[in-house]
Amino acid sequence: MAPGSNGIMDGMHRRIGEAGAFFRSFVPFFLQNVRHDRIFLSAGSLAFQTLLSIVPLLAVVLSILNVFAVFAPLQPYVEDFIVHNFVPGTGGMIREYFSGFIGNTFTMPIFGALFLFIVALVLISTVDHTLNEIWEVHSPRKVLQGFTLYWTVLTLGPVLLATSLAASSFVWYTVFTEGPLLELKTRLLSLLPSTITVLALLLLYLLVPNRRVRFLHALSGALVATLLFEVSKRWFAFYVANVATFEHIYGALSVIPMLFFWIYLGWVVVLTGAEIVYCLGARRLSGPAAPEFDPLRGVPLMLAVLRMVWRAGGEGVVLDMKKILREFHRENPSSLRKIVDILLECRFMHLTASGGMAAASDLHVMTLYDLFIKLPPDFGAEDFGQAGPAWDGIELQGVRERLGACFEESMHVPLIQLMDGSNEGQV
């Protein structure tokens, strides 16, 4: 295999290893935050409030559409789109109830309509508070800033939804009318609900947290949440069609627990996506976990390099830096160069007349301690890899344990003695 192919394969293995390490560290961190934020309890609270607010919220949305004459004909299409695409399995029954409830709200007096608007604002405020708790934002929005955000969501949200439906309808019925374009139209229409879900969740994760959120993190959370949402829709539709536990128990009232259960699932998905977005940003800010303290960090790699040079000298082979880098291709090249520089400066190795490297002739009298005390103070901060094939035979676990015992014995001093300076001679 060509050297270039080896480099490509090594790069792929390294990236796969890095991805695996990321997921191994990310998943426990994510689960820990899910438990800490109690998203299932928050989802239940939001589901209950949504069940009480959904009719006022839809009434406000449709009322705003009625204000604009151009969008008034789209009202039934918006109703159908919301119910059939976001409440699976019970769309016909729920739409019939919603139409009656919403029709009743249109006959309410002005104070009743104002109450509906306040109820819708309270729901959005609760969502805002819940998401900001996930992001650990303890400073609430200013009243004017929060009201502006909620007002924008209630007014521009329906307009944007209706505009997208109107634009798509114009394109569907003027461009995609026959032949292959008609088939393409059908496929694109099937993707429209998922696309709107991704965009809605993306805006939710970007705008609602009172903290800067990276676009890529918000998009990742929105995509994962949309995938979970589609899986939940299919499972819920299957459950309603084949199991029908709620209908068997509650009869004609089954629509209420079914709707509540579906809203609960939806909020679990939304909050799960929010946790993913938060954890991606938190992991990036905190960086990788700090390695455990190891006074011999990097020493095994240094001994492996020194052994390689020593063995090559015994076989009459001259080594240079390129050969060392090729042998230790899994390691950080800058760390390897620093190791070689230290060994040369401390005379554990020397350069030959031909420019190669050779081990010192008195290695049999030099000790590990002689090597250790020559290490620079920042040597342990270098980026050293994990033990690989080139490290075989370099085993320092016994030395590490004895060194740890010496540290423990030497530092077995109560901290209070260091605070007040008493018994200083015992330190």
Swiss-Prot record:
Entry keywords, A to Z: Cell inner membrane, Cell membrane, Membrane, Transmembrane, Transmembrane helix
InterPro entries: UPF0761_bac (IPR023679), Virul_fac_BrkB (IPR017039)
Residues passing through the membrane, by range: 51-71, 105-125, 147-167, 188-208, 221-241, 251-271
Listed GO CC annotations: plasma membrane
Keyword field contains Transmembrane helix: yes
Broad class of the protein's primary localization: membrane
Cross-referenced Pfam families: Virul_fac_BrkB (PF03631)
Cellular localisation: Cell inner membrane
Membrane topology (UniProt): Multi-pass membrane protein
Keyword Metal-binding: no
Xref: HAMAP family: UPF0761 (MF_00672)
Family label: Belongs to the UPF0761 family.
Protein name listed in UniProt: UPF0761 membrane protein Plut_1323
Lineage of the organism: Bacteria, Pseudomonadati, Chlorobiota, Chlorobiia, Chlorobiales
